[in-house]
Amino acid sequence: MAKVAILGAGNVALTLAGDLARRLGQVSSIWAPISNRNSFNSVRSLGSLELVGPDYGGDFQPQLEDDLETAISGAAFIFLTVPTMGQQGILCELANFNLSSSVLVALPGSATSLACKQTLTPAFAPIAVIEATTSPYACRRVNAQVLMLSVKRTFEVASTQALSEEVRGGFEILFPNRLQWYQNPASIFFSNTNPVAHPAGILAAKDTIEQGISPIPKFYRKFVPQAITRVTAIDEERLTIVNALGLESETDFAYCKKWYGGHASNAREFYETFEGYADIETPRNMNHRYLSEDVKHILVLWVEIAEVIGVQVPEMKSVVQEASDVLNEDLSHTGRGLSSLNLEGSNANAIVRALNGV
């Protein structure tokens, strides 16, 4: 079976490693950047881990590599599993190596194809970059247990290049899910729905968090449903951008139903009742990735692209402003925008091409 290298040592990385080990008998190489090795070092100290899943599980021992070159050497698939704000640093390190025999996979993607185009040496670029809308699982690690809380029925991916049947088949077998192939990575960028629910939910929880109320209600049980009107408004604005650009996507609720199933008839009911989200804690601090990543690195760019194509996004703008106030930082200037991506002055077609890694 083709070698898999996993960059990052967080929840998704370890669940993917455990899934491959227990379902396919495959040991994956795991590497993490020196600047962010808390989880990596913790796993090393534990030795072996236990995958706990709804249908299968068991012990596995990740192959931890201190050296990036060793980790990716001979890998057919290199998985980038770090948050959006950590991807660029790793891509800069990958630029030192020949990736022309590998496929780079962003799990999930967030304009990763564009970042690769701007960062990696063309002659040594990967066969293709594949971006995913989401991770294959709802998951988290608790000490030595890697909890695969729920396996998504399907999730969406897109590639910068047409893949051979051999490469595509080798990729699809790595997952317990059925994959839905979108036409291009630009659609994936606008279908990463983290900025739809996360920022609205944590902003709804602001007073509770800042007052230090304990026990604090669960994030998806209490605060996302409390903000559901705002969540829905952001989602509608997102889809208006998608339609204006001629891309493909679905509503946040449609994705939730497609990924997880269940009997919920609307978004509020889903968030209030889905067991896979039931125990997810509310952040204890407002300086959290729900704002510092989902707003700063994704939503800001959505807003700027909307302005280019003449789409009104008042709810998105209000979230950017509130997040800026909370973080004491003008995210419309410090966030990832068109100018920081060398796309200032670009028209809609040029922006879509860039997001597709062209």
Swiss-Prot record:
Its EC number is 1.5.1.16, 1.5.1.11. It catalyses: D-octopine + NAD(+) + H2O = L-arginine + pyruvate + NADH + H(+); D-lysopine + NADP(+) + H2O = L-lysine + pyruvate + NADPH + H(+). InterPro entries: 6-PGluconate_DH-like_C_sf, 6PGD_dom2, NAD(P)-bd_dom_sf, Opine/Lysopine_DH, Opine_DH. One of its GO terms (molecular function) is D-lysopine dehydrogenase activity. The keyword Transport does not apply. Keywords: Crown gall tumor, NAD, NADP, Oxidoreductase, Plasmid. Reductive condensation of pyruvate and arginine, lysine, histidine, or octopine to form octopine, lysopine, histopine, or octopinic acid, respectively. NADPH is the preferred cofactor, but NADH can also be used. Monomer. PANTHER family: BLR6086 PROTEIN, OPINE DEHYDROGENASE DOMAIN-CONTAINING PROTEIN. Belongs to the lysopine/nopaline/octopine/opine/vitopine dehydrogenases family. This is Protein ocs.
